[in-house]
A protein has these predicted regions:
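Canonical P-loop GTPase G-domain recognition
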Residues: 180, 186-240
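Long, well-ordered amphipathic alpha-helical subdomains in the mid-to-C-terminal portions
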Residues: 13-15, 215, 226-302
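Alpha-helical scaffold elements adjacent to nucleotide-binding pockets in ATP/GTP-utilizing enzyme cores
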Residues: 85, 122, 147, 151, ...
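Conserved Switch II/interswitch segment of TRAFAC-class P-loop GTPases
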Residues: 150-168, 179, 183-192
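Nucleotide-state-sensitive switch-loop elements of NTP-binding domains
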Residues: 2-49, 58-144, 151-157, 165
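Walker A/P-loop
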Residues: 52
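Expand to "…catalyze enediolate/carbanion chemistry for C-C bond making/breaking, isomerization
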Residues: 3-8, 14, 32, 43, ...
Length: 307
């Protein structure tokens, strides 16, 4: 079975993802030759804002009109076991009846903040497999919002009328990255006030896009059609404004950075770092030790070692 055939089989596609996650960079490079033009949508917001429910409702509607949808849910992981804490996306059970959907939870494997090192690789696999719409659900930690900006074409930021105020939004950095703002759970608080606040604060982007603000009650499918319409409008804007090429370039740069950072983190988490810590305590120069660590990563990687 060749790579193209494997990408058409969900079980084989899962195996491809696992191989890449286990360090198969040749496979990661090969996948890049097959990526197409999937639209990538990052969904972020504080825990409890209804991200999983919203993605499930959006996906259901898209699947009903013959889209092929991939969903990557970033789960916080145990810093001890490295395993996902949340496991499968229990709120997405309604999608089980559809054939053209692929859902995978990704453990951050103890990485503090941000996305998994292999999120971009998994997006590339789904893209190469012909999934035309790919959702990335973030944990909502702050750093992952910055990370998802490097991958997604469109970013949905969820707000809840009962959680926080505009000052907290600014602290989270969400005002700078969002393309569409969804005030979800609109029946649980002063949603109209939150919408007014956002419309006053949000400014037109340098690229010419004016962020949208939409009211939603995702659990009751209220606002879903309007959100999809805004996603479609932003996708057309991305393609017509020249932003698509910039986003693809940003995605590849981020992919390279994440692979390099993962190698460095493996060294930092290994027993080797203990000896370096002892040397620091004994008075060895910090600059020399950092140079040694970087050299070690380069040497081991050049040997094809498991760094």
């Amino acid at each position: 079975m060749n790579l193209k055939e494997m990408l058409l089989d969900k079980k084989e596609m899962s195996k491809i993802m696992t191989k890449i996650e286990n360090g198969d960079e040749d496979l990661s490079s090969e996948i890049l030759k097959h990526i197409k033009d999937a639209r990538i949508i990052g969904v972020t917001g504080v825990p409890g804002s209804g991200k999983s429910t919203l993605i499930a409702k959006l996906s259901s509607r898209l699947l009903e009109i013959n889209h092929k949808v991939g969903i990557l849910g970033i789960d916080p992981s145990s810093p001890f076991s490295g395993g996902a804490v949340l496991g499968d996306r229990v709120r997405m059970k309604e999608l089980n009846k559809y054939e053209n959907v692929f859902i995978r939870s990704i453990s951050t494997r103890g990485k503090i903040g941000g996305l998994s090192y292999y999120t971009t690789d998994f997006v590339n696999v789904l893209d190469a497999a012909g999934y035309d719409t790919i959702f990335i659900e973030t944990v909502g930690t702050g750093q992952d919002e910055v990370d998802v900006f490097n991958i997604a074409h469109t970013i949905l930021v969820l707000q809840v009328p009962t959680l926080g105020d505009e000052v907290q939004v600014i602290k989270a950095g969400q005002l700078e990255i969002g393309d569409i703002y969804v005030v979800n759970k609109a029946d649980q608080g002063p949603a109209d006030e939150k919408i007014k606040e956002l419309n006053l604060i949000l400014k037109k982007r340098e690229n010419g896009w004016q962020p949208k603000v939409i009211k939603s009650i995702a659990v009751r499918s209220i606002g879903i059609d309007e959100i999809i319409q805004s996603i479609d409008e932003h996708w057309q804007f991305v393609k017509s404004s020249g932003l698509l090429e910039k986003k693809i370039n940003l995605r590849i740069k981020y992919l390279l950075k994440q692979h390099a950072m993962e190698k460095l983190d493996r060294i930092m988490e290994s027993e080797v770092i203990d000896s370096y810590a002892d040397e620091i305590i004994k008075g060895k120069n910090m600059r020399e030790i950092v140079k040694e660590i970087i050299t070690k990563v380069g040497v081991e990687y050049g040997k094809g070692g498991n760094v």
